[in-house]
Amino acid sequence: MIRKGFFVRIFLFLIVIFSPVTLLAHGTILIKNVEHSEGFIDVKIYTNEETFLKEELSYETVRKKAMKGEVIIPLSKIHEGKIAIVVYHDEDGNGELKTGLFWRPKEGFAFSNNYNPKGPPKFKKAAIMLEHGVPVAIELNY
């Protein structure tokens, strides 16, 4: 005979396992200031200067449906170490960042380390130390 307490313990265990806080326990990026729900949020993770901004050489790529406000991006390949994160809001869903005069982005974009370059972006200025279990917050600029 199974006691009632057994089911309560299983229920509590499942709540803990599937709670949003638990989802943030691994490498996680919180994309803030998403202006609207159109398109996708594209995230590229780079681990060194040589591959930085070479999309086909990014260490990890995540593309997730945009949601107004905040989007949680879980990382599956990396959970700690030195990385640079590049994020853009692909508003029209074409897979490319729209740029204007002097290649200035026309869609929401951001780099890790609150880096807002005035010229060509540099890995060492965008680089951060990703700590296991500590989410990284990045605010999009439009």
What annotation goes with each model-predicted range?
Residues 19-20:
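N-terminal signal peptide c-region/cleavage motif recognized by signal peptidases
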Residues 2-11:
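Bacterial N-terminal signal peptides that target proteins for export
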Residues 92-98:
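Acidic, glycine-anchored loop motifs typical of Ca2+
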Residues 63-69, 130:
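Short proline/glycine- and polar residue-rich coil/turn motifs
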Residues 24-47, 99-142:
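Primarily secretory-pathway and cell-envelope proteins
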Residues 83-87:
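A short tyrosine-centered beta-strand micro-motif
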Residues 70-77:
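Exposed aromatic-hydrophobic patches
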Residues 36, 67, 79-80:
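Surface-exposed loops/turns
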